[in-house]
Every structure is written in C-alpha cells, then in structure tokens.
C-alpha cells in the first residue's frame, strides 16, 4: 500500500513538474510574440500615399476602391496596434475583422471606428471599397479638441465600434 501511494505521489509530482515546464515554455513563447504597433506615419511609409489622398500634419483622408489591390492587408493579418484614430466607411463588399476580442463584419454602408492603441486584426476582405479618415492623437490635440470631453463617446465606440448606416 505504501508503494502504491508512493507511486501515485511520484507520478503526480512528475506530472506537476511537466506541467510547470510546459507552462514556462508557453509563457516564454507568448512573451516573445509581441503585438506589432505602429503610427499613422509608419503606416504611410510602408503603404505609401496615392496622389488623390489628402494628408496634412498627421491626418489622412483616403479612398480605396479595391482594398485587396490597393492596400497591403498583410500588415493587419495578425493582431496589430495602430496608434491613430480611424473612421472607416465601407461602401461596397465586406471586411471581417477583430477589434480587441470582438469579431466584426464591416459590410456595405457600415461605419467602423478604431481608437488609438486598440488591437486590430483583419481576417478577410471580400471585394471591399472603403473611405477612411485616419488621425494621429497629436493632430486631434493640435486642433484643440479636448479629448476628456469625448470620454463618454469613446466608451460607447469602444463597446460598439461598428455601426451599420
């Protein structure tokens, strides 16, 4: 009987040790995989601007008639943190994305709002055309909009970033 208890204790300690090793390995991998983060300026450096895009001092207004052909969606294939406000209107097709931990389908005539620092991932794009306004936080501050006054609005947008029109 003592040997049975000893065997159970030995295997339980061994399993516990194996579990601790497994958890350390997983946590180590999670720590190594950091979420990519970039600003509007970096996004423009990577993707470039088209002649018809309007850009002024940290604010971009742009349209992409065929998102797949005109924009590098691979940047958002994995969770990414974009440090800019973005208001995106989908006029055609659809985009399936995840904002934070919530999955959204941004369909035709849908407005999507991204807050700075939120995590965004694009899963698929189906024949989408979009119109977008992207602004760095500093741009909003320079034009004297008091972000504290918009706290309630930001809380609602954070809960419901996608709005069918």
Question: Which residues make up each language-model segment?
Answer:
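Generic protein-terminus/edge-of-domain signal
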Residues: 2-95, 104
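N-terminal regulatory/effector-sensing and dimerization cores
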Residues: 61-162
